[in-house]
Amino acid sequence: MSRIGKMPIPLSNQAKIEIKDSNIRVSGPKGTLEQRLTDQVTVSEENGLVTVLRIDDSKKAKAQHGLYRMLISNMVDGVTKGFTRKLEIAGVGYRAELKNDLLALTLGYSHMIYFKAPDEIKIEVPDQVTVLVSGIDKALVGQVAAKIRSFRKPEPYRGKGIKYEGEVIRRKEGKAAGK
């Protein structure tokens, strides 16, 4: 049995779960998330624990078992605590600011980059070189953070660009000088 899939998901008293046909809905103080289930797994809830079981031992069912267990676990965490990704901007003159609901980035190009986040995502700029992306859907938070990072990925020679908090940029040496 899948090591991840066999672990039950504890429900906090703030989170409620509804299972209808092949849909699962998790609601909590921060919002509501829905997920469509595959026919390879079944989900049940009893005594504040959610269990995910697979219908057979096929290779596909085994793969789906752990996947859906983690998706549901992330949904429960999202509606109770939420998720946040922190981005750091490094480089002379590189900065971010929030204009209305647009993230305005100055990243060394001849123009500013304006980014509109989806409605479910909240973007904060505590200072000019830090961007916080938060929301209840872990995948969407990661996707938006990756999109913002893609505007100017960190380069290996000087380390300029946008990186995740704690990300280690492998640095390279420049060209060796001639004789």
Curated annotation (Swiss-Prot):
Pfam families with a match to the protein in the record: Ribosomal_L6
Keyword list, A-Z: Ribonucleoprotein, Ribosomal protein, RNA-binding, rRNA-binding
GO biological process: cytoplasmic translation
Cellular-component GO terms for this entry: cytosolic large ribosomal subunit
A GO term for molecular function: rRNA binding
UniProt function note: This protein binds to the 23S rRNA, and is important in its secondary structure. It is located near the subunit interface in the base of the L7/L12 stalk, and near the tRNA binding site of the peptidyltransferase center.
Family: Belongs to the universal ribosomal protein uL6 family.
Assembly with partners or alone: Part of the 50S ribosomal subunit.
PANTHER family for the chain: 60S/50S RIBOSOMAL PROTEIN L6/L9 (PTHR11655), LARGE RIBOSOMAL SUBUNIT PROTEIN UL6M (PTHR11655:SF14)
Protein name, as recorded: Large ribosomal subunit protein uL6
Gene from which this protein is expressed: rplF
